[in-house]
Amino acid sequence: MLGTSGTLRRTFLYAFAVAATLVAVINALNVITISHEEPQLGLAGPLVWEGSSWLTLVLFFWIPWIGYRLAPPFVRPRWRLLAHIPCALAFALCHVAGFVLLRKLVYWLAGSRYDFGAFLPHFLYELRKDSLGYALFIAGFALIEHLLRQQQLIETPGQSFTFDIRDGAKLTRVSLSDILAVASAGN
């Protein structure tokens, strides 16, 4: 799943760490906001709601990764990007079904009952949020992989960076350290 490249493994792990941290912060802010705006709800409910959402998001983070590996943002042919539609739907469905099941379990253990309401309208609401999250995860994967590959280029020993000069059919490679200035012939 992660590939044999160390870059891909690190891309997934760094993205996972960043996503888990950012979503935890957002969920903590949601708990604070709910507790402030509706103090009659207490703290337990919002903690269970936001905690179950965070946990299932983390558990199903591999789904956007699969989508990214199937169709990175700059993939050719472009129609392959359509692979993100079923992946985003699967991610949202697993996230929502997962947190609903966790909430039902926690409420049951506490001697209570959790009611998510009508599934379709609530799922469509969550789908919009999860689709945005999915897109941000894909962008995060692309950014992190790009940065890691750039770092890898810099750290490669003995590598000299060159600038290609084309003059008709002739190609001249000049070491970047030998270039003082670049000007165009106006073509």
Regions found by a protein language model. Give the residues of each.
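Hydrophobic alpha-helices of bacterial signal-transduction systems
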Residues: 1-152
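Conserved binding/recognition cores within well-folded domains
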Residues: 151-187
